[in-house]
């Protein structure tokens, strides 16, 4: 898999971008990971790439994906921020935050 100019998770915005999710869906096709990202992409489109609800299994799949697949594609700091956010989501309401909970 080649590196993309887009990243699937923006630490500064604390969310997925629909374009990056689209890239990952294309990269993984009809595999379980591809289906997961297709589901997330659909949810992002319904909400205009704002907030997206993730189930515990989806969060678990994303943690697996970071640990086993994309760790070589992205900077370590981005992945650490990503995993911290996923850890918080496991114990919080299942909403992918558009911005920091303290913002605004």
Language-model segments: which ranges?
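Positively charged, low-complexity terminal tracts
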Residues: 1-104
């Amino acid at each position: 898999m080649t590196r993309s100019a887009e990243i699937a998770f923006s630490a500064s915005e604390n969310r997925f971008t629909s374009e990056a999710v689209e890239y990952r869906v294309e990269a993984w096709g009809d595999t379980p990971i591809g289906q997961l990202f297709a589901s997330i992409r659909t949810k992002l489109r319904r909400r205009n790439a704002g907030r997206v609800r993730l189930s515990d299994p989806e969060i678990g799949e994303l943690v697996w994906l970071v640990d086993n697949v994309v760790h070589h594609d992205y900077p370590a700091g981005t992945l650490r921020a990503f995993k911290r956010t996923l850890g918080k989501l496991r114990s919080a309401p299942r909403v992918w935050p558009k911005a920091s909970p303290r913002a605004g």
